[in-house]
Design a protein with these regions (language model features):
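Vicinal oxygen chelate
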Residues: 1-16, 20, 44-47, 54-55, ...
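Core segments of cupin and vicinal oxygen chelate
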Residues: 13-16, 23-65, 103
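Acidic di-acidic motifs
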Residues: 27, 93, 125
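Short amphipathic alpha-helices within nucleic acid-binding modules
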Residues: 34, 95-100
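Short, charged/polar surface micro-motifs in flexible loops or helix N-caps
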Residues: 61-66, 74, 93-96
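Short, charged/polar, Gly/Pro-enriched secondary-structure boundary elements
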Residues: 62-67, 127-131
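Helix-adjacent hinge/juxtasegments
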Residues: 79-83, 87-90
Length: 143
């Protein structure tokens, strides 16, 4: 028997915050250098609890969500390096963010403008994981 969803029988979902996104890489130290030195991400964790496991976690400037990569972490490190596409970094001024990354040695594509003034520019890490800078005019007050 199907039950109709009404406001009376739908349980509210509590607030959830995205905390950690795995990014598969082939060389942990090379990726660590890229994200810290080139992208300016904050190194949060770099631990090796066992001989076969290493966990490295970074947070983009101003973000509450971090990325993680390493070795010996089961399904996370079994992912194909370079297979993550379309991670978005929302910025207040895409031209400023793009120039800052270029100034640090990151190859960033040209800014493309789309509907409603949304702008995008993409770059990739050494393994080919693709990141997208995104500027949304209606969110400019957040920066």
């Amino acid at each position: 028997m199907m039950t109709e969803n009404t406001k009376e029988n739908i349980t509210a979902v509590p607030e959830m915050k995205l905390e950690l996104v795995p990014v598969p890489v082939s060389d942990v130290d090379r990726a660590k250098a890229f994200y810290v030195e080139k992208c300016g991400f904050k190194l949060e964790v770099d631990v090796q609890p066992t001989d076969t496991m290493r966990v490295v976690q970074f947070t983009p400037p101003g973000s509450a969500c971090s990325i993680v990569f390493g070795t010996g972490m089961g399904d996370i490190t079994a992912m194909q390096p370079g297979s993550v596409k379309g991670l978005h970094l929302v910025v207040g001024d895409i031209h400023e963010a793009r120039e800052a990354l270029i100034g640090r040695g990151v190859l960033v594509g040209e800014v493309e403008e789309h509907d409603q003034g949304v702008k995008y520019a993409a770059f990739s890490d050494p393994d080919g994981n693709i990141w997208t800078l995104q500027e949304m005019p209606w969110r400019s007050s957040e920066f």
